[in-house]
Amino acid sequence: MTPPLLEIRNVTRRFGDFTAVDNVSLTINTGEFFTLLGPSGCGKTTLLRMLAGFDQPDSGEIRLNGQDLAGVEPEKRPVHTVFQSYALFPHMSVAQNIAFPLKMAGVAKSEIDARVEQALKDVRLADKGGRMPTQLSGGQRQRVAIARALVNRPRLLLLDEPLSALDAKLREEMQIELINLQKDVGITFVYVTHDQGEALALSHRIAVMNQGRVEQLDAPETIYSFPRSRFVADFIGQCNLLDATVEAVDGERVRIDLRGLGEVQALKSFDAQPGEACVLTLRPEKIRLAQSVTADSNEVHFRGRVAELLYLGDVTLYIVELENGERLETLLPNATPGRTKFFEVGDAVEAAWRFDAGHLVRA
């Protein structure tokens, strides 16, 4: 079994009375695109700074390829960091910016030229070496910053919210560029972001952080479909959170009391006990709307009324107010074959979902 490239063991970092990183342990594999995801103040950037050597843990250890990095200065680590601000030298050409760290390392000119040429090819800027940074688009400047970080052939590339300054369309284009680049160069990427969509699109695995701790570490599909906590369900994408109490457990099914709505069935997802408080997490796209629903033992359905709607192009977001006042968000595609009915505000509807469409978490 191949040992992990990076090991973070029980790392804690405090600033006075505030614990920014709280006993975090992670392993990151060679060639992995790994993302630290969380809201502002969750500890993700502090953890990244410790990986880079810009900060030191109060306790715990960080090992890269088996080497303890305690006391190893940033410039002596086989690690490079790409920042949101690009940090390019405006008086240097693109090629000169990329060559700069090699010159500082005393690399021979012939090798510098060859490695700069390859780095420009890697980021698809082979014809832009003579340009100045001001002559490039935001996405191109970001690629130059990445090329400069890669030219020294680090074992680990750290990216601190590198796309957050770009507009939405350019961000999407750069996400594809990053995925392809990481596959091509085979270097381990550790990516920090607060953007859930970015994390889901880019990553092999995601560590969702909250208040200095890792709430969940999983593949993107698992985190989205099977969140382990209310926080993760709420933070990742849109999600309906319905408070409930466990009434009974029957094999893989759980009977729960949705407060104010009555008893329904759900799929068992943890060691639930009767009387235990829980939350049914339900993604909007899992709910269907109809004027009436045929009774089905595998479905849950409630009457309600369309309170609000928001047209989003490919889908429409419906806010359905149920008879007890609870509101459900529902996403319906606008181009569904055979769909002729589009609901309007005030329409009476039934909201329905399969019993296994939701995911139970502890309250």
UniProtKB/Swiss-Prot annotation:
Topology of this chain in the membrane: Peripheral membrane protein
Q: What is its main location?
A: membrane
Q: Which major enzyme category is it?
A: translocase
The reaction(s) this protein catalyses: ATP + H2O + polyamine-[polyamine-binding protein]Side 1 = ADP + phosphate + polyamineSide 2 + [polyamine-binding protein]Side 1
Q: Which residues form the ABC transporter domain?
A: 6-236
Recorded GO CC terms: ATP-binding cassette (ABC) transporter complex
* Organism superkingdom: Bacteria
- Please list the GO terms describing molecular function: ABC-type polyamine transporter activity; ATP binding; ATP hydrolysis activity
Concerning InterPro entries, the annotation shows:
AAA+_ATPase (IPR003593), ABC_SmlMolc_Importer (IPR050093), ABC_transporter-like_ATP-bd (IPR003439), ABC_transporter-like_CS (IPR017871), Mo/tungstate-bd_C_term_dom (IPR008995), P-loop_NTPase (IPR027417), PotA-like (IPR005893), Transp-assoc_OB_typ2 (IPR013611)
Q: Do you know which PROSITE patterns this protein is assigned to?
A: ABC_TRANSPORTER_1, ABC_TRANSPORTER_2, POTA
Q: Keyword Metal-binding: yes or no?
A: no
Keyword Hydrolase set for record:
no
Where it sits in the cell: the answer is:
Cell inner membrane
Q: Where does ATP bind?
A: 38-45
Q: Which family does it belong to?
A: Belongs to the ABC transporter superfamily. Spermidine/putrescine importer (TC 3.A.1.11.1) family.
Quaternary data: The complex is composed of two ATP-binding proteins (PotA), two transmembrane proteins (PotB and PotC) and a solute-binding protein (PotD).
NCBIfam families (alphabetical):
potA
Tell me the protein's name. Spermidine/putrescine import ATP-binding protein PotA
Q: Which organism is it from?
A: Pseudomonas aeruginosa (strain UCBPP-PA14)
- Gene encoding this chain? potA
